[in-house]
From Swiss-Prot:
It comes from the Bacteria. This is Antitoxin RelB. Keywords: DNA-binding, Repressor, Stress response, Toxin-antitoxin system, Transcription, Transcription regulation. Pfam families: RelB.
Length: 79
């Protein structure tokens, strides 16, 4: 059996260990479950979303326009 050693921020460690304890899961069990999921599904068990404020604004504009589409006239020359 192998082992993994990693460095994390002290505050993050304390918060995550406390949350895991509430769930009745050890950090080793949590990491093992995550690695099993990745091995079986070849993807992370959560969505990675790191958006800048500008990107988040753009996403909101796109969502709004999709909710309320308006016709747009475009000529072939403009394409």
């Amino acid at each position: 059996m192998g082992s993994i050693n990693l460095r994390i921020d002290d505050e993050l460690k304390a918060r995550s260990y406390a949350a895991l304890e509430k769930m009745g899961v050890t950090p080793s069990e949590a990491l093992r479950l995550m690695l099993e999921y990745i091995a079986d599904n070849e993807r992370l068990p959560f969505k990675q979303t790191l958006l800048s404020d500008e990107d988040a604004e753009l996403v909101e504009i796109v969502k709004e326009r999709l909710r309320n589409p308006k016709p747009v006239r475009v000529t072939l020359d403009e394409l």
